[in-house]
Amino acid sequence: MRTIYLIRHGLPDFPLGQRMCLGRTDLPLSQEGLKQAEDFAEKLKNQEITVFSSPLLRARQTAEALHRPIIILEDLQELSAGEWDGLTFQEIRTRYPEIYAARAADKTIPLPGAESNEDGLKRFENAMQTAMEQSQGNLAIVGHGGIMALFLKAHFRHWEKPGYGQIITLLYDNGRFIKQEDSQKCVHF
């Protein structure tokens, strides 16, 4: 049995403190985000793990807090947000009012020019499979909330986007993922 720690990067350093739709926008961590990374690294300091990370800076900086070699996997990147990538939510509300309002009720409505949820999920699952094949024992996957939420929702149904710096612990046994806190729910991989 292997333990997999899915770790969402810490809080990014948003320009002028305005939250934005990040997608592939490459921001560093804020001071709070660096602290979040150090906090979770403390919790994992005695764990023997292989660390995999998205290539985006906020994920790499988070992974660096673990003080272990990092294997970068391109397919761990966040979903592309298309035309919304890098825009503040106020800019999105102004430029795309109909889609913004509709997505408040249904997050499956695609963003203009963005990667589809299906393509993103397939990409992330391929990255998870690659990480499993390239490592022995336990591993940490440092990445992004949107893509992780898709994976978790697809396999465990009711799941919210992980918070900044949050760790989700899964067990992997005989081709299935099991939520550590609820071993009744599992997914074959």
Regions found by a protein language model. Give the residues of each.
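Active-site-proximal alpha-helix that buttresses catalytic centers in soluble enzyme cores
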Residues: 2, 7-71
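A glycine-biased structural micro-motif
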Residues: 46, 86-89, 136
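Generic beta-sheet signal
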Residues: 4, 49, 135-146
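Domain-level recognition of soluble alpha/beta enzyme cores
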Residues: 157-182
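Acidic, His/Gly-rich catalytic cores of divalent-metal-dependent hydrolytic chemistry
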Residues: 183-189
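Phosphate-handling substructures
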Residues: 66-123
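Short beta-strand scaffold positions
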Residues: 53-54, 122, 142-143
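GST superfamily/GST-like fold recognition
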Residues: 145-149, 174
